[in-house]
């Protein structure tokens, strides 16, 4: 995966800032996002064309942080386990927070560049090594815990091939480029996990429906002119499709799909002017109505996971 400058800038700001008591820490937000992402990506693996092994562990790297961020503690490696979700394959295999990751299936994990500087390149390279492995084959990880090195074998499960990041600080936005989903840190202060899941499912809907590739194929442009004319219509169509697909993704993951309707009806005002402020996005009222109409078409006895007819649009050009 490629570095994302906006995330890096936000990360520096988060570490430098003094957070108010009500604001979740970066680790707390990362943990909440990891739980939501685990549910959505594993439950909807059958709907994702590109998949990867999912372990339930989140990685970070020393060069994502300013010098001295780890205090006097010497990190076990350049890439570390930030958190492990309970009950996941990583937890069952014995991975723990702060374990250093040295190799993936015998392939060495890159070492952080000596010249320093804030970058997610090292972390991304480690994630790419894992993502490139078979989705359901045993995954041997060479780790360092303290001064001892060992191999821990994780039995992953298939999940959608996409990574997740918290945009730390007061950002209320959310975005997806087809490879990485970024969720604004302020959402974790404003909303509970079920509500944040609506936003995450929407962004995952973009990935499932291949919106980045389809928008590029349609000749869409990003930037100041993206809101106008045919370009604006293309983006609005993609946003509506992601809303509808997101409701199905929620349902497949055990969330109440109607929570998406409730979110836009009751919380839309909190994000209007922030998360979905431009004319490339429908109004909150229109979003709620479209999702309600779509869910009314789902068969009462629909299987889980449900593959809605909407899924076929990922191979069709945007009109």
Annotated model-derived regions:
Residues 20-62, 68-75, 127-135, 140, ...:
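C-terminal capping/extension segments of zinc metalloprotease domains
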Residues 89, 184-198:
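Short pre-active-site segment immediately N-terminal to the catalytic Zn-binding motif
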Residues 62-100, 237:
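Mid-chain, structured segments of secreted extracytoplasmic proteins
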Residues 1-8:
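Bacterial N-terminal signal peptides that target proteins for export
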Residues 90-118:
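Conserved PDZ fold ligand-binding element
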Residues 8-16:
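Bacterial N-terminal signal peptides
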Residues 80-88, 117-132, 137, 184-185:
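N-terminal post-signal-peptidase region of extra-cytosolic proteins
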Residues 210-231:
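Post-HEXXH active-site segment of zinc metalloproteases
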């Amino acid at each position: 995966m490629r570095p994302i400058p906006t995330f890096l800038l936000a990360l520096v700001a988060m570490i430098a800032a003094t957070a108010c008591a009500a604001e979740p820490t970066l680790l707390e937000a990362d943990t909440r996002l990891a739980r939501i992402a685990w549910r959505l990506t594993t439950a909807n693996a059958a709907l994702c064309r590109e998949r990867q092994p999912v372990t339930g562990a989140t990685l970070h790297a020393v060069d994502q942080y300013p010098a001295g961020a780890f205090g006097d503690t010497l990190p076990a490696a350049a890439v570390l386990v930030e958190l492990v979700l309970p009950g996941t394959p990583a937890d069952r295999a014995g991975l723990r927070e702060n374990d250093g990751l040295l190799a993936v299936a015998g392939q060495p994990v890159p070492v952080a560049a000596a010249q320093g500087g804030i970058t997610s390149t090292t972390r991304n390279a480690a994630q790419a090594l894992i993502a490139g492995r078979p989705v359901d084959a045993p995954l041997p990880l060479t780790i360092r815990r303290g001064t001892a090195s060992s191999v821990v074998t994780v039995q992953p499960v298939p999940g959608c091939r996409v990574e997740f990041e918290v945009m730390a600080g007061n950002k209320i936005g959310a975005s997806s480029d087809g490879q990485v989903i970024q969720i604004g840190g302020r959402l974790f202060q404003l909303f509970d996990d079920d509500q944040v899941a609506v936003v995450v499912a929407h962004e995952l809907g973009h990935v499932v429906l291949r919106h980045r590739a389809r928008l590029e194929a349609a000749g869409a442009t990003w930037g100041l002119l993206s809101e106008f004319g045919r370009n604006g219509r293309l983006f609005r169509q993609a946003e509506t499709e992601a809303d509808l697909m997101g409701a199905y993704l929620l349902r497949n993951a055990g969330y109440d799909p109607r929570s998406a309707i409730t979110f836009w009806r009751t919380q839309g005002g909190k994000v209007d002017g922030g998360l979905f402020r431009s004319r490339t996005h429908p109004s909150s009222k229109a979003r709620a109505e479209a999702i309600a109409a779509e869910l009314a078409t789902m068969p009462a006895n629909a299987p889980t996971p449900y593959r809605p007819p909407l899924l076929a649009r990922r191979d069709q050009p945007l009109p």
